[in-house]
Every structure is written in C-alpha cells, then in structure tokens.
C-alpha cells in the first residue's frame, strides 16, 4: 500500500495527462514550427518523443540530438504517470548510462522547481529517489541483476563474480584446453583428430594455431542466441550445404557476372579514349583494338547468355574460358597511363578457379570438421563447468544465463514483460544477436523504442551485427503495423563545411553493398540551425598528403605506422591554428585507427612544445620496469634459487649491486657441486667459505648481509601476512615507492606500483591465496602473450587529444585531424586458415594430399592448401563486411568535427593518375573500385579524381619537404607575463574584486542557513538524527547517542573461509520473511522454511536467520498470537510519505519510510516494528528508536485520523524474542 498525504492530512490524488494521439502530435509539431523560439525541436524529434503504443525505430544521424530525444521521452513518460522504475533503458557503455542518468536527474530537478502542484512535486521527488534504482545501464549489468535474483532457477548461485581480466580467462582456458586435448589424442577417433590438428598447426606438438582456432570458435558462438544450438546446427551448415557447383549461391554467381560486365564496360571506356589508337595509319583496326573488341563482345555475350551457355554446372568451364580470354596482366596502357581494367576480374577468377578439384577434395575434410565441432562443444561445456565451480563467469555467460532464465520460466518472463512499460535501447546498431534475444524476451511485442544509426556501427570485432538494425528498418518500412521508423536527419553539431564534405564523400561512396546503407536523401546530414549554415572559407576540409616521391625513409618499413613527415604536417597546422586564430589546444583532436605505433606523434609534438594527451596504448603493464622489478622480487621471495629473478633483484635500485659485485659473488662456487645457484654462493660468501673468499671485501659483505636480512624478513612475512601487506612492506623497507617518484614518468610508475598491490589484494579476495599462486598466475599471463590493463593517470586539461576513432564515438571536437589515412585496412582475418560466419558456420583451408592427381611419384605425399567453397563464400562476405565497417569508421571520424576536418596521409604525387572516365559513371564509385581501394586516402582521391567537376567541399594538397623545415613549421607563441602595475587600469581586476565580495556574502549566507542547505528534499526517519546532530545546538534538543559495545562484547575473529554475514542483511531478510509469511496457517518450522524460499536473499543470509526465534515469537508471545488473531486488520511493509517543516530553516521537506506492521481498527491503530540489533538491556533500544516510532505514529494518525494507542518493538537480537512497549 502506498499513501501520500498533504499538510492537512488528506490523501493525494494525482491526475496524469494521457499520451498524445497522432493528431495531437501533428498539432504540437505545427505549434513548434510557428513558435519564435531560437532553438526549435524538429518535427521528427517531436514525433520520436511523444509517439506511443507501438514499436519505434529511430534512425538518428550524427549530431541529431538522439540523447536529447531519449531524455525528453523518458521525462514525458514520467509526467504521464509511468514510474521511472517501469522503464528498461539500455546503453552501450557504463559511462553513457551515467551521463543519461545525470541528464534525467537534472530534468527532474528542473521540473520540480517549475511545478506549483504539490501532489506533482511529491510524485516527481519520489521519481528522483527511484532514479538510482532504475534499470538504466548496460545489457551486461541488467543480466547480472536477473541472474543474481533468479539464478537459483537454473542452478546458478547468486554469489558469483565477473572475470573481467582477459588474462585470468586465458589461464582457465589453457587448463581446460590442455586436459581436453590429451583426452582427444587418446580417444578412438585419435587419427582423425591428429589430422585436424596438423591441418592448422602443422604438427601435434605445436598446438598454438589449433588452440587459437578453438578459442575463436568458442568466442564467436558466445555472441549467438544459444551457443550450444549454434554449434550443433549452424557450425557445419556451409560444409553440409555447399558440396557441388550447383550449390553455389546465386548472389556469388551474380557478383562474378557483374565483374565480367564491369570489365567489359571499363575496357570499352578505355578504347573510346582519344589517345587509345583504334586505327592504324592505313585506317584499318589496330590489332590491339581488335583483341579488346573481342574481349568486350565475348564477356558481354557470356554474361547475357550465362544460363543457356554454362549454368551453375558449367561454372568451372566459364572460369577457364574467361581466364584464357583476358590477358594475364591487370593493366591497359594509354599514353603511358596504366588503367587497372582487369584487376577486379582476376580477383574474382582466382576465387572460383579450380572449383572442381576443390570440391573433389572438400568432402575429405568433413570428418575433420566433425571432430572440431565435437572438440569445441566439449571445450564449451568443460570451460563452463570450471567457471561454475569457481563461481566466476564472463559477461557472455551471465547474458546466456539470463536468456535461459527468461526462456524456461514463463512466470519470470511475464513478470518482466508486465512490469516494463517500455524497453528502450540506445546505440541499437551495435547490438549482437544474444542481446537482441534478451530484449525480445523483455518486450511484450509492441513496446520497444530503439535508437541508433546504421552508419555508425563500428563494433563488428565485438560481434555486433548492423543487419539487426537494417532488418528492423526494412521490416517497419514494409509493414508499418510491426513498428514505426522515424528519421532524425538534422545535425546540430557541425558547421556546413563539415556537413557538406561528409555528404559529398559518402553520397559517392556508401551504399547497401559496401557500407550497409544507401547514403541517399534519407541519410544525408542537414544543418539543424541557421547559424550552422554561415560559411567560413578557412574551414574548408583539407586532404594534406606528404609527397613521398622523395621519401627520406622516415616511414616505418611496413608502411602501416604514421611517418615523421605526416606528424610534422599536423604540428604545423596546429601551430598555425593556435598562433593565428587563438584556438586552444583542447579544441583539437587527433583521430587514429589503432592505439599502436603512435609514439612518434608524442615525440614530435614534444619537440614543438605542443602538449598532448592520449587514451592509452598497448597493454604493457607487466613489462614496465618498476613492475618487472617487483615481480622478480616476489619470485625471489617465493624461491631464492631462481637465479634470473635473484639477479634482477640484486641489480635493482633496492640493493644496487653492480656487475663487479655479481662477478665476485659468482666466483664463490663450491667445487664439489656441478650446479651451484647464486643464492648458495651468496650464503657461502657471507660466511667466508666460498672458493675465493678474498674477493669479498667489507663493503660487499655489508651489502650481502643487508640483503639476506631483508630477504629473510620478507620470506617470513610472506607466510603470515597478505600479499597486499607484503608488497607495501617491500615498498617501505627499501623505499622503492619513493625512489620511482624521482624518476621519469614518476606519476605513471607510482600508479603502476600501487595497482600491483591492489591487484594482489583482488587476487586473494577472489579466493586464491598465497604468493606462489599469484606468481604462477602472472607467469601464465605472460606465457599466453597477454598483459594486464594499463593504469591511467590524470592528464593535463589544456592539451591536444589523441584517441582512436572508436574511442571518439559519441564525442565532438571543434577541430579534427584524421591521421594515417594511407594506412591499409587490416585484412588479416580474410587470410586466416578459417573464417566463421553466423549463417554459414565455419569455412576452412584444407591441407589436401593431391598425390593421386600427379600420377606416379616417389613422394610420400603432396600437400596443397585449398580454400574450400564454404571458406570462399565466408571470405567474400567478410571482405565486404570489413570494407563496410571501415567506411563507417570514416563516417564516425568525419562527423566528430564541429568546425573543420583535416585528412592526413602520404602519397606519390607523380603516380597520382586518372582512374576512369567520369562521364561513364553514375553517382557512386563502381563497386569493383570500392572493393579494390583499401585506404581512406584511396577512397578520397578516387572521389576527387572521378568527380572533379563537382564541388566536393575538400581540397587535395601535396606537402613537400621544403614546406616542413623548422622555419616553415614555425614555433608556438609563448604568452608574455603581465606587469603587476598594468592591472590598475584593468577592468577585469574590478570584476574579480566584485566577485570576491559576492563569494564572501554567499559564504555568510551558507553559514547562516547551514541546516537548510544540508537538508534534502526527502528524508527517512533513521536519517533525521544524522542530519541534525552536527547542525543543531544541543540546547533543548535530545541527541540520542548510539550505544557503544562494551569490552566484554569483544570476540575473537573467525578464521574460516566464509565471509561473515552482515547484520543489516539479516535484518532485511527478516523483514521480507515477516512480509510474506502466511498467517492463516499454523506457524512452525516447515511454514517458515516454505516462506523463506520465496525471499530474494542469498543462502548464507537465509541460513543465518534464527527460525526458532521467529517461531517462538508467534507461538510463545501474546503479540505474536495477536498477529494471527487479527490478521485481517494487519498491514505489513507499508510505505508512507508526509510533509514536515524543518524547525531550523523553516523549509518544507518530505519524510518517507516503510512501516513494518500496523493493525487498523475502527477507532485506533496498533504499531509494530522489528529490530535485529544486538543489545544488553531492552531499554537501550527503546531509547534509541523512540523518536522513530513517534514519527511512524504521526504518519498513521495524519492519514487515518485515528490515534495510535500502542507502539511495540519486537526485539530479535537477543537470546529470545522480547516485546517492548514504547
């Protein structure tokens, strides 16, 4: 029961406005359009905020205000009576959830201040209080809630932890893999399994490649709705389906025919060029022209008549015919310019070549794939079993548990579906199929609100599938009854210079084939305000390319990293912006594709004095010097006979032994022993029994004694103390923590050392104990080529930002530099020995023995790696998916800019050439060309070249070495120091003086009204004492002191592994039990146990409840029997809220709380409150809680206009239950 009352004691009734009809929304849109507001909401924003009663997909372009729309929609729901806790709001990151929560909080505060309706104020205040418990967060966080609450239904304990550290996951995986591998190597099908391992690893001894295959298959399966079913039903889908030429998908045939036709068209374009030379001097056709005409005609004929001439069964014959028809080279040369006419077709032919042979051998690899399927399934089950045993899971496990709970428990699923008024999702384009399934289970089928942008889907490496968004988009447009699509196209972030160049680039680049979205009028960016359309000539986008014709060799050898010259170009532009236009450094951001190989940027910027902060680099925590020193110290403490670790410790700054010292120690060998460790030599050196005691001088002897004494104390402490304390003892004993503070990058070094102590502490808290296990865990991390996350330290605010494009998503910056545009897209995945696909399953390269094709030969075997047909199909899809994501990455990078965007790259000016005739092209770059180009820079140059007659809103400029001299780059202007005497005429100094006066006045007001300032709008009875005790004078006020425990209460700590159950948790469980306990039945142990199963507490807390004491209360006390006799008059766990006046500040506030139990009769009320506090005398608790019960009584009296005649405390913290009347 929930009751709110006003100052007169009357119940509050709030009348909420209904949701808007489509007609009302149109009327609101018209009013907004005609209003004189400076910043108006768009018609689409209004539609997205107020439309209700159906599924809604909001396609929100960059900078279109999607967060604003979500916040406004949430607030509108609240104002129309939907409590915030009835909204499910999913965000992509924890940070986004925090920001969204803060925005809602600010909106609620603003709404409370604006409204004059008292009932609404109280309601909104309650929403504000509920905000912190509302379901606003990531899908992972919500899944954890579901499993914590209902995990028992599928046998999962609620007391689990999340393995967020990849290193810990890899250690467990390695243990499971090794055990399973040995089992499979000794099974009945061992020969087939060995062939499988050799297919990927070459031999059975080096299993690293096979292990990586298994891990990848496992991880991929975890992103599906049901990993086990996917592995059983989809993993071998393509291998079972594509076994003949006739099985090749029509789409792939169409792509081949399209490449043939495009080649014919491009070749015709080339032959039509003026300088081509169709005729000889005699006027007849040239041999070259005749040959090319034949190619054009035959390619066109074969495409047109493919079905009757070849068909799928004759595909292999078509491949041979085309291969014999076209030249082996890629280019056609006209006037010394090479045109890559045949390049794309050659790539397609390569894909389909030798199909008959491949299909003949492909069937031989099927038993291997079945073994792989069995192994991955077994690995998944075994790995999960280990995690269940450790009660430690990955996020994907928790999500699958949540799905299983909702699928298998109809009552739980329906309770969520009935509870949530709306299921809202931000960044919907980055969902995977596992998350989509969870959202489907939470929704009632017509209450989903999804916000996203297909053009900003850039998390494929996390198994995000943009096709989920695309499918919804298409379905809702074709069938409006399923849902509504709302487009937010207006951009409120960027100036027209940025919007125009973005539209120009992607209208020529992006479509459904590459990019997954046709960049037409639906997706083009539109300025949201007039101010954004004001032109600035100096903000036109620029593609700045270092001319590599005379490259000085400063670029990395693999051409993947950014060169010094490119960074210098950026530095030059930044200096110009800062000096000439006064642009602060923090307004400038550099975007890169990856975190690696960016040291040259920091180094170059330091040379020019440009401050820069980065979002981190490669994980090198365990490789940092200070951490390596500490790890070797711990290794030495664990085992002093580890020579490598011992030498590292001796050479470290903690003991500072030099090479001469170590040489003298090394010569103290015992001649009778073949192998003698360094630790033994140190001990012999100290007692003078080494082979050459004369080499140990007094200074060295002193150092050795100090070392052994220190090491002995550390080893003794390691047996008794915690890892955390041991590490800090090492820091303090040898002052190592203080030492690193004097070195370069002191902040980072100290942060790393501090983190080591924290991680050791976390390691022990997770159930692992001891120095040996910690060292073993670290060594396993290093063995698996992993590292721990780097520690972040505070960065300067006034500095240029360097971050990855992924990290920049959702952010905006005035000036954006997109660096390393000449870096080739990573195509590593499409060259692996296997490729996974959600629909097709796995495709592999099969190492076939083709000895039979060669006839007689003395060779035992002839192995050839073949791309199986499933592999080729997966490869083509993966290539397009990779290019599409790179295109979307470029879109994200460009749309971060508010004022200007720069593209930085490197190219040869002399090799820059025309690609094809623009007159023969449509709006888009040809598909074959977009597939062929593999850098941002190539795309931009192709657009600039082919569509040169259009205004593309960006300029291409080549930078020479002469433009990058020290004089040309310039230097930063340093601000001059002001003369203090000049401040006397400075207006700003007067303003500062007035501001200081105002601050002083504010401080005085704060002091006078301190009680009101510290008084929240809503308080609970138990909080009142904590609020007023430090603020009120003690005159006339009774301060209820907490009773302190006497010394006789002291008990020795328990050294068991089980954590002590908190008293507050026991109290909470007691209240839940008393609320659900059926009083119509006899109260006995069985009744209590049945009721106990229905409360949401963990088993440890339930076990800690003293059920005999509760049974005694009901059976042996008159009040307990009173509960059963008058149960019809009983109200349990009843919330209340009343308005009270603060005696000090005279400010009104809402007092709210929950009454444990009360009996409502016709003429009076009886109040009951349970307490689990420990006590010596009951009078202690009576004094402590008297004021609280008075407040409860006041609330009941104001509500029912009846007196509270009896107030009882039920004390459960003693030996037996006691009843105290207050």
From Swiss-Prot:
Residues in UvrD-like helicase ATP-binding domain copies: 39-495
Pfam family, one: PDDEXK_1
Subunit composition and interactions: Heterodimer of AddA and AddB/RexB.
Signal peptide: none
Binding locations of ATP: 60-67
Protein EC: 3.1.-.-, 5.6.2.4
Entry keyword DNA damage: yes
Family to which this protein belongs: Belongs to the helicase family. AddA subfamily.
Keyword Nuclease appears in the UniProt entry: yes
Superkingdom in the source lineage: Bacteria
Catalysis: reaction(s): Couples ATP hydrolysis with the unwinding of duplex DNA by translocating in the 3'-5' direction; ATP + H2O = ADP + phosphate + H(+)
Function text: The heterodimer acts as both an ATP-dependent DNA helicase and an ATP-dependent, dual-direction single-stranded exonuclease. Recognizes the chi site generating a DNA molecule suitable for the initiation of homologous recombination. The AddA nuclease domain is required for chi fragment generation; this subunit has the helicase and 3' -> 5' nuclease activities.
HAMAP family (alphabetical): AddA
Biological processes per GO annotation: double-strand break repair via homologous recombination
Matching InterPro entries: AddA, DNA_helicase_UvrD-like_C, DNA_helicase_UvrD/REP, P-loop_NTPase, PDDEXK-like_dom_sf, PDDEXK_AddAB-type, Restrct_endonuc-II-like, UvrD-like_ATP-bd
GO molecular function, one term: 3'-5' exonuclease activity
GO CC, alphabetical: cytosol; DNA helicase complex
Name recorded for this polypeptide: ATP-dependent helicase/nuclease subunit A
UvrD-like helicase C-terminal domain span: 524-810
Keyword terms of this UniProt record: ATP-binding, DNA damage, DNA repair, DNA-binding, Exonuclease, Helicase, Hydrolase, Isomerase, Nuclease, Nucleotide-binding
Cofactor(s) recorded in Swiss-Prot or TrEMBL: Mg(2+)
């Amino acid at each position: 029961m929930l009751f709110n009352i006003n100052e007169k004691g009357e119940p509050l009734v709030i009348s909420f406005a209904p949701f808007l009809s489509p007609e009302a929304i149109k009327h609101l849109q018209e009013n907004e359009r005609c209003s004189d507001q400076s910043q108006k909401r768009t018609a689409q924003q209004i539609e997205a905020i107020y439309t209700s009663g159906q599924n809604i997909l909001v396609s929100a372009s960059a900078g279109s205000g999607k967060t604003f729309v979500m916040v406004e929609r949430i607030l509108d729901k609240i104002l129309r009576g939907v409590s915030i806790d009835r909204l499910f709001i999913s965000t992509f990151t924890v940070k986004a959830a925090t920001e969204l929560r803060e925005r809602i909080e600010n909106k609620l505060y603003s709404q409370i201040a604006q409204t004059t309706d008292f009932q609404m104020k109280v309601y909104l205040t309650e929403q504000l209080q509920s905000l912190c418990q509302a379901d606003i967060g990531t899908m992972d966080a919500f899944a954890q809630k579901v499993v914590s609450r209902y995990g028992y239904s599928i046998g999962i304990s609620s007391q689990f932890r999340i393995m967020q550290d990849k290193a810990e996951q890899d250690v467990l995986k390695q243990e499971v893999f090794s055990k399973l591998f040995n089992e499979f190597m000794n099974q009945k099908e061992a020969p087939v399994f060995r062939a499988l391992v050799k297919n990927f690893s070459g031999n059975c001894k080096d299993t690293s490649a096979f292990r990586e295959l298994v891990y990848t298959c496992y991880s991929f399966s975890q992103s599906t709705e049901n990993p086990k079913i996917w592995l059983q039903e989809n993993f071998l889908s393509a291998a079972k389906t594509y076994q003949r030429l006739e099985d090749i998908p029509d789409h792939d045939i169409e792509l081949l025919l399209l490449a043939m036709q495009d080649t014919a068209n491009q070749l015709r374009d080339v032959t039509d060029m003026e300088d081509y030379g169709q005729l000889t001097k005699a006027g007849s056709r040239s041999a070259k022209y005749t040959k090319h005409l034949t190619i054009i005609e035959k390619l066109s004929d074969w495409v047109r008549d493919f079905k009757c001439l070849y068909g799928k069964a004759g595909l292999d014959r078509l491949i041979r015919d085309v291969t014999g028809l076209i030249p082996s080279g890629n280019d056609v040369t006209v006037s010394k310019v090479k045109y890559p006419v045949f390049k794309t077709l050659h790539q397609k032919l390569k894909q389909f070549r030798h199909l008959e042979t491949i299909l003949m051998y492909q069937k031989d690899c099927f038993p291997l794939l079945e073994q792989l399927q069995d192994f991955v399934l077994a690995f998944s089950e075994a790995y999960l079993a280990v995690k269940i045993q450790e009660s430690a899971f990955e996020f994907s496990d928790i999500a699958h548990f949540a799905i299983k709970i909702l699928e298998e428990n109809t009552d739980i699923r329906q309770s969520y579906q009935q509870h949530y008024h709306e299921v809202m999702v931000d960044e919907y384009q980055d969902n995977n199929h596992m998350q989509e399934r969870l959202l489907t289970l939470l929704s009632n089928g017509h209450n989903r609100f999804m916000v996203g942008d297909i053009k900003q889907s850039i998390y494929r490496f996390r198994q995000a599938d943009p096709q989920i968004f695309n499918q919804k988009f298409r379905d809702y447009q074709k069938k409006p009854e399923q849902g509504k699509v709302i487009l937010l196209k207006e951009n409120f972030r960027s100036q027209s210079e940025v919007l125009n160049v973005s539209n120009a680039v992607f209208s020529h680049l992006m479509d459904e084939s590459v990019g997954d979205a046709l960049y037409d009028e639906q997706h083009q960016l539109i300025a949201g305000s007039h101010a954004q359309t004001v032109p600035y000539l100096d903000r036109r986008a620029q593609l700045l390319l270092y001319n590599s014709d005379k490259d000085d060799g400063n670029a990395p050898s693999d051409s993947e990293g950014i060169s010094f010259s490119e960074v210098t170009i950026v530095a030059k532009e930044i200096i110009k912006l800062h000096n000439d236009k006064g642009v602060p450094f923090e307004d400038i951001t550099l975007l890169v594709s990856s975190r690696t190989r960016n040291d040259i940027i920091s180094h170059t910027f330091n040379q020019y004095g440009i401050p820069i902060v980065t979002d981190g680099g490669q994980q090198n925590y365990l490789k940092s010097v200070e951490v390596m020193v500490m790890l070797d110290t711990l290794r030495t403490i664990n085992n002093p006979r580890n020579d490598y670790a011992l030498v590292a410790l001796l050479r470290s700054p903690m003991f500072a032994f030099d090479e001469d010292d170590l040489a003298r120690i090394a010569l103290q060998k015992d001649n009778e022993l073949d192998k003698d460790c360094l630790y033994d030599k140190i001990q012999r050196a100290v007692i003078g029994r080494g082979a050459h005691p004369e080499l140990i001088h007094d200074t060295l002897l002193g150092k050795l004694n100090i070392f052994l004494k220190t090491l002995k104390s550390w080893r003794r402490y390691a047996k008794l103390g915690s890892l955390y304390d041991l590490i800090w003892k090492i820091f303090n004993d040898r002052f190592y923590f203080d030492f690193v503070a004097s070195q370069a990058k002191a902040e980072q070094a100290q942060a790393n050392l501090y983190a080591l102590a924290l991680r050791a502490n976390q390691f022990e808290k997770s159930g692992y104990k001891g120095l040996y296990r910690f060292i073993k865990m670290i060594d396993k991390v290093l063995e698996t080529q992993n590292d721990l996350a780097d520690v972040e330290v505070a960065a300067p605010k006034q500095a240029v930002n360097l971050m990855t494009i992924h990290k920049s998503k959702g952010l905006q910056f005035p000036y954006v530099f997109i660096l390393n545009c000449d870096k080739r897209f990573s195509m590593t995945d499409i060259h692996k020995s296997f490729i996974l696909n959600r629909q097709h399953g796995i495709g592999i390269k099969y190492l076939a023995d083709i000895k039979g094709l060669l006839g007689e030969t003395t060779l035992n075997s002839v192995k050839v790696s073949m791309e199986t047909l499933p592999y080729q199909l997966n490869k083509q899809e993966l290539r397009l998916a990779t290019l599409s994501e790179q295109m979307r990455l470029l879109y994200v990078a460009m749309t971060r800019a508010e004022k200007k965007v720069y593209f930085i790259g490197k190219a040869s000016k002399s090799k820059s050439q025309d690609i094809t005739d623009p007159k023969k092209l449509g709006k888009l770059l040809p598909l074959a060309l977009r597939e062929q180009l593999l850098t941002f820079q190539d795309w931009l140059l192709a657009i600039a070249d082919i569509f040169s007659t259009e205004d593309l809103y960006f300029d291409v400029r080549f930078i020479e070495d002469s433009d990058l001299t020290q004089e040309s780059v310039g230097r930063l202007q340093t601000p001059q120091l002001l003369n203090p005497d000049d401040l006397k005429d400075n207006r700003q100094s007067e303003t500062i003086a007035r501001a200081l006066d105002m601050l002083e006045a504010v401080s005085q007001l704060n002091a006078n009204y301190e009680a009101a300032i510290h008084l929240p709008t809503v308080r609970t009875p138990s909080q009142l004492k904590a609020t007023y005790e430090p603020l009120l004078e003690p005159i006339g006020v009774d301060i209820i002191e907490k009773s302190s425990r006497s010394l006789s209460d002291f008990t020795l700590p328990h050294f068991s592994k089980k954590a002590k159950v908190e008293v507050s948790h026991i109290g909470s469980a007691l209240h839940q039990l008393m609320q659900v306990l059926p009083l119509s039945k006899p109260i006995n142990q069985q009744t209590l146990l049945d009721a106990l199963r229905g409360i949401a507490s963990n088993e440890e807390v339930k076990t800690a409840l003293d059920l005999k004491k509760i049974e005694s209360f009901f059976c042996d006390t008159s009040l307990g029997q009173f509960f059963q006799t008058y149960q019809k008059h009983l109200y349990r766990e009843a919330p209340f809220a009343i308005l009270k006046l603060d005696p000090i500040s005279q400010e009104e506030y809402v007092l709210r709380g929950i009454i444990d139990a009360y009996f409502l009769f016709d003429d009076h009320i009886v109040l009951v409150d349970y307490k689990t506090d420990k006590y010596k005398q009951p009078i202690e608790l009576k004094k402590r809680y008297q004021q609280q019960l008075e407040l409860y009584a006041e609330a009941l009296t104001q509500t029912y206009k009846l007196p509270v005649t009896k107030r009882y405390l039920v004390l459960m913290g003693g030996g037996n239950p006691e009843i105290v009347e207050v």
